[in-house]
Amino acid sequence: MTALTVMVQGTASSVGKSLLCAALCRIFQRRGLRVAPFKSQNMALNSFATLDGGEIGRAQAVQAEAARVAPTVDMNPVLLKPEGDSRSQVIVLGKPIGSLHARDYFAYRGELKDIIARSLGRLREAHDVVVIEGAGSPAEINLKDRDIVNMHVARAADAPVLLAGDIDRGGVFAALVGTMALLEPDERARVAAFVINKFRGDLKLLEPGLDMLTARTGVPVLGVVPYLKQLRIADEDSVSLEGRRRRAPAGPGELDIAVVRLPRISNYDDVEPLEHEPGVVVRFIERPDEIGNADLVLLPGTKSTMADLAWLRASGLAEAVAARARQGGWTLGICGGCQMLGGAIEDPEGVESAEPAARGLGLLDVWTRFERTKTVAQVRARLAGGSFLGPAGAVNAGEAEGEGAGELTGYEIHMGRVERVGGAAAAFAIGSRGGKAEPALDGAVSADGAVVGTMIHGILDNDGLRRSLLAALRERRGLPRAAGEPAIPSRHEEYDRLANAVEASLDRALLDRIVGLDRR
């Protein structure tokens, strides 16, 4: 039987569509249904590697995990990774097809519609419910004739639409009514209910507004979802990153981690596990004076290493980071950050830049050569030497014992090759890629152990390694070690917390009627 569908659209970006979809995936999964997420086209710099080596938006990987299914490229058949100047790398069914200007990309929409329809069809054949996420707003009237992600998909899937608005930013009633006013009659008819998201306060005070909203539009309110604090679920939207730049400085007993906020930052969810650790303050910085007395400086991934390296030099951060590292300051680079910490960076084919070559910061003995072949893989690895950062043995993979002890997981997403030179020590020894044995060495460690680079995203998601790193940082500062391991919820516990809050806020009977579950 073909799967039922439900679609979450929003009045704007960052109203909570991705998390609402993740909640619905977990809600339906807990009822014993086979659930899959779907987003036809995603524009994001946070991406994820599927087991078969495809690249999809991070949000759909999160939603798949919430649904307890393996992420596949059909869940996000088109991914756009912005490169600047109205250009994006276009990834179709997990593979890059090139970099296109927005005007050129729109010429492909007919072909993309067919690809999207086939992906959606495969998901519907294999599952009971498909939870579909829209993008931005369906009321972008200047783009409506090019739509392949909002009402076009709702029609193709015959999906009822839940229209979400963010009350925390203000103006939610105007946003919902205004969106409905700009939709075509057939599109308005497809909107089955409203969801008010991120509510704080007394619901009784909101109820008159909800009644007026339904009276004006004829659309019921499915529920009012509370503002949920400190969810350990990866963000995708750059809007969420903006808020995290304005963090208070670390207190006397807290660890201070400074993340360089590169203009083209990508996969910045690499640092989220650090943000959720007690006694740790993560700051995003853009100026040399903001480094302060940071215990760790982290250079994250970037969509354009060459361009962001030029920005790093122009901002003065390159010199400041290098000077600090040469004095023994601990520094970590992930993916593009690893490349920047190295020496020669070559781009003879113009994969990333018109510049054929550049020099990194010279803190690691690695050489980078960009090539058109893209590496996308889930990996399993171990520490290659005595330590991850600091003196040998200071940081390890944790205290686990038995089969799999010391094994780390993550994923690679990068163009070209990064190789060690001059006998540099590797950071990690990869054992497998994509579930297949493929031994290789990754990254590099400086001679004094103060600087480490790796091409593996998600490495700090490994609890043992992360906590060992934080313990070493505390010891270096003379701070007491944490009293035992903090009780940090697992991601699945967080999906349940999210689902519990959303399910308690929605009219279940109405939701079942909208989706069609009352008839099955």
Curated annotation (Swiss-Prot):
Offer one example of a GO biological process linked to this entry: cobalamin biosynthetic process
Q: Which domain of life is it from?
A: Bacteria
Q: Which residues form the GATase cobBQ-type domain?
A: 254-465
Q: Which protein are we looking at?
A: Cobyric acid synthase
Q: Which UniProt keywords apply?
A: Cobalamin biosynthesis, Glutamine amidotransferase
Q: Name one GO molecular function term.
A: ABC-type vitamin B12 transporter activity
The record ties this protein, via SUPFAM superfamilies, to:
Class I glutamine amidotransferase-like, P-loop containing nucleoside triphosphate hydrolases
In its UniProt entry, the species of origin is given as Sorangium cellulosum (strain So ce56) (Polyangium cellulosum (strain So ce56))
Q: Which family does it belong to?
A: Belongs to the CobB/CobQ family. CobQ subfamily.
Disulfide bond annotation, renumbered to this chain: none
